[in-house]
Amino acid sequence: MHVKKYLLKCLHRLQKGPGYTYKELLVWYCDNTNTHGPKRIIREGPKKKAMWFLITLLFASLVCWQWGVFIKTYLSWEVSVSLSMGFKAMDFPAVTICNASPFRYSKVRHLLKDLDELMEAVLARILAPESSQANATAAMNLSMWNYTPLVLIDERDPHHPVVLDLFANDPTGSASSSPGPRGACNAQGCKVAMRLCSLNGTSCTFRNFSSATQAVTEWYALQATNIFSQVPQRELVELGYSAERLILACLFGAEPCSYRNFTSIFYPDYGNCYVFNWGMTEKALPSANPGTEFGLKLILDIGQEDYVPFLASTAGVRLMLHEQRSYPFIREEGVDAMSGTETSIGVLVDKLQRKGEPYSPCTVNGSDVPVQNLYGSYNTTYSIQACLHSCFQTQMIASCQCGHYLYPLPRGQEYCNSRDFPDWAPCYLALRMSEAERETCIRMCKESCNDTQYKMTISMADWPSEASEDWIFHVLSQERDQSTNVTLSRKGVVKLNIYFQEFNYRTIEESAANNIVWLLSNLGGQFGFWMGGSVLCLIEFAEIIIDFVWITIIKLVALAKGLRQRQAQARYAGPPPTVAELVEAHTNFGFQPDVGHRSPDAEAYPDEQALPIPGTPPPNYDSLRLQPLDVVESDSEGDAV
């Protein structure tokens, strides 16, 4: 009951409002606020009132402008970077090594036979066009040539370039005049390009190169990709270099190791790659001390005599240092070690800690990245390279209806090949050169919030020396082939030393440059400096704003009620009837004579007199009219307040 009465009083209080006019409320605020300035506006003379009004308005505007600047700075989510140094024993990084040649030529020769013959003919046409013009091409398989041929572009006349097909007798071009003889087209006047045409030949584009070496290398790699994409991966593994053949000697610190301590993965660019200390099934190995003697030492046999001649133009190994349980993107982040040398790699560790949203667009584990991670089957941690490759493969499948051989496939998709997807090569090259598609993937992918980078200092020296070359190769050949004959040479071996330069590591950490404490401090400082205000002054200002809105709502409600009442009164001509008139209007008319409807027998009684109707006039009920509810409540409200 008390709660109901209290709520009813609150409702009446809301209906009545503050009880002030706008002017009275404003004067009350200026007289009672703790903010400097408004009191002088109402207490001084006319001139000083105007002066203090302008000063107060100026400083209030200045405070609002400063507040806007600080809030905008805070919402820009700027970060500050701190660098700290630490010293502790650290886990040795994972080391991935790959041979520069993905396959052994002796095992893939049958797959590349047609391509190699075509490549030799192409080189002959480019290097000696006159002597090779008469060579027959009927014996060669030109099916792969028809999809993406190499052409010569004669640019001696810049306004009328001529396109010359290497295996066609008649040149085709944009010039109306006949071009000069093929022999006259030298390296300065002609450029080798790759012609990319759709299946029906309606649209063609040319991929130009500044050197014929670049042109034939990329063309051969594109055709080799088309061939290897049709071979199952388990067979491709057998075509590459085995760990037992590649790794001749291994030593980690003072403990010997072997190829059995490496985990094998297949990387399409480099074939079989091997990871040391990956940490997938075993605990990461720690490094006892910095220095060469406490690192990883490897002697590798790259087997350069069995390289694919047109596919691998670099002799050596490709290696990469990375975190445990992370996938090695060795093509993008690896370094090369040259054969016939001892390569020493000193390692420094940088740990990156990004702040995260909204300060830095990073992700903890990739769960908030809208790209399917195609490397999830390897059970590795998230990386931006995995996201970029997965994004490109998704775009490749959407645009070309097939996936590229270099990247993992989503379930239910197929790798591209010219037999099933004749248009895949032009589609792939157009997608790879599309800046819009690259920007799309960059926007969708995020950096990892916590990352470890290994900075390498690389030095090289000839190995072995001429004085020790004979006995070292004898020992290594004996250990590998159990033969007294020397089967190794300087051009086929690589020695690696990987070690920590020092146990000092750097931590690069992001922190918020402007936090909420900074924002409140600056907002309060500006308000207090220019107007002598505080948080309570803001509450006072909010109170008067609420009262202004309250009064405005009450006035609008009263105005709406008045309009409805005037509309209702307009229906009647006179004033509204009183209670007595309403009661008299409902008097029983049964005792009144029926003057309008006289009986036909009325003339039979001419002397009949109309008798008076007895009755008592009704009381004056206007004197008992109740007062309006708001009048009664206003009296009681005064007592309550």
Swiss-Prot record:
The chain crosses the membrane at residues 51-71, 534-554. Residues 596-641 are annotated as: Disordered. Keywords: Cell membrane, Cytoplasmic vesicle, Disulfide bond, Glycoprotein, Ion channel, Ion transport, Membrane, Phosphoprotein, Sodium, Sodium channel, Sodium transport, Transmembrane, Transmembrane helix, Transport, Ubl conjugation. Glycans are attached at N141, N261, N379. It is a multi-pass membrane protein. Residues 1-50, 555-641 are cytoplasmic. Residues 72-533 are extracellular. It catalyses: Na(+)(in) = Na(+)(out). GO terms for cellular component: apical plasma membrane; cytoplasmic vesicle membrane; plasma membrane; sodium channel complex. Pfam families: ASC. GO terms for molecular function: ligand-gated sodium channel activity. InterPro entries: ENaC, ENaC_chordates, ENaC_CS. Originally identified and characterized by its inhibition by the diuretic drug amiloride. It comes from the Eukaryota. GO terms for biological process: multicellular organismal-level water homeostasis; sodium ion homeostasis; sodium ion transmembrane transport. Residues 632-641 have a biased composition (Acidic residues). Component of the heterotrimeric epithelial sodium channel (ENaC) composed of an alpha/SCNN1A, a beta/SCNN1B and a gamma/SCNN1G subunit. Interacts with WWP1 (via WW domains). Interacts with WWP2 (via WW domains); inhibits the channel. Interacts with the full-length immature form of PCSK9 (pro-PCSK9). Interacts (N-glycosylated) with BPIFA1; the interaction is direct and inhibits the proteolytic processing of SCNN1A and SCNN1G and the activation of ENaC. Belongs to the amiloride-sensitive sodium channel (TC 1.A.6) family. SCNN1B subfamily. NCBIfam families: ENaC (TIGR00859). This is Epithelial sodium channel subunit beta. It comes from Oryctolagus cuniculus (Rabbit).
